[in-house]
Amino acid sequence: MMTLYSFSTEVRLRCAADYQGVFDGALFKVHQPHFLFLAKPSEQLQSRLGVIVAKKKVRRAHERNRIKRLARESFRLHQQQLGLLDIVVMPKIGIEAVSNADLHQQLEFAWQKLQRQAKKYQKVAVSPSLH
């Protein structure tokens, strides 16, 4: 079976309520030097991604677009391994000066951390309680 690596509308957080759900119910947080990732288990059939790049954090539009593009592309390639998560990615101040290669590396580490946290959570949620 061929794995799909598309970034269709089904894998995007689209409305404010989707984003608010992640902010309010974030069970997983991953801090990287230039990114913050928030995630919660998804109620959908696949992982979804939302990227927030505030003008206050990244002044130039082409830099905001570059950051969003890198985050989306990295997610697209890792979405099959992440399990069912709704994820919001937010850059930190100073990200404009970082090279694409460094950002790719930070994104790789973040996906790995999220994957480990989600697996640990699933084991705890599935394991029978000892009463």
Swiss-Prot record:
Enzyme Commission code(s) on record: 3.1.26.5
Family under the similarity heading: Belongs to the RnpA family.
Cellular component per GO, a single term: ribonuclease P complex
UniProt-recorded name of the protein: Ribonuclease P protein component
SUPFAM superfamilies for the chain: Ribosomal protein S5 domain 2-like (SSF54211)
Keyword hit for tRNA processing: yes
Top-level EC class: hydrolase
Catalyzed chemical reaction(s): Endonucleolytic cleavage of RNA, removing 5'-extranucleotides from tRNA precursor
Alphabetic keyword roster: Endonuclease, Hydrolase, Nuclease, RNA-binding, tRNA processing
BP GO terms, sorted: tRNA 5'-leader removal
PANTHER family: RIBONUCLEASE P PROTEIN COMPONENT
InterPro entries: Ribosomal_Su5_D2-typ_SF (IPR020568), Ribsml_uS5_D2-typ_fold_subgr (IPR014721), RNase_P (IPR000100), RNase_P_CS (IPR020539)
Quaternary structure (record): Consists of a catalytic RNA component (M1 or rnpB) and a protein subunit.
Gene name linked to the record: rnpA
Function: RNaseP catalyzes the removal of the 5'-leader sequence from pre-tRNA to produce the mature 5'-terminus. It can also cleave other RNA substrates such as 4.5S RNA. The protein component plays an auxiliary but essential role in vivo by binding to the 5'-leader sequence and broadening the substrate specificity of the ribozyme.
UniProt xrefs under PROSITE patterns: RIBONUCLEASE_P
GO molecular function, one term: ribonuclease P activity
